[in-house]
Amino acid sequence: ISLAEQYGLEKAEEIMIEGMEIAAKDISEGRAKAIGEVGRPHFPVDQDIWDASNRVLLRGMELARELDVPVIIHCENEDDTDQSLAELADKAGLDRGLVIKHSSPPWVTPEETHGVMPSIPASKSNLKEALSKGTDRFMIETDYIDDPEKPTAIMAPTTVPKKVAAWVANGQVPMESIYRICKDIPDSLYHR
């Protein structure tokens, strides 16, 4: 948004796309493994900003398709978000499974994800809900905690290993699911 305020919307869109083109060059030269984070505002904006954000997002998906790499999305979490991301992926010709929804709610079923790959913050409640749905098609992550009352709060990088160790210790999650969530899925996306 501040780019659009500073340079105008058209120039801001050009700057964002140019940044992704640079990232694509880094990927092609072996210095990166994915396009992103790319996305849309997760707060109300004017339609012209929303449309420009979707054009930038579409270009990121096109670059990901050209390079056969994932694109990491940071955007809103509405009921139709994953469906709209899946539709953009289809438009770009990108496999929906290469669209990684960063900071995803625990939406893990095919009906919820529409083929998009959820990456879920590793909170106890998120993990419990995701696992209760009977699938292990998701990744777990750490991030800033999106709480206006705690603007600098983070989920430490040690959170994921601690959660996984607890799963192993209490037998809460089958080892094959742990391998899928923590190794097989990330490897399939980032070691193509």
Give residue spans per PLM region.
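Active-site-adjacent beta->alpha loops and helix N-cap segments on the catalytic face
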Residues: 51, 80-83, 126-135
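Short, charged, surface-exposed secondary-structure boundary motifs
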Residues: 109-112, 127-134, 149-154
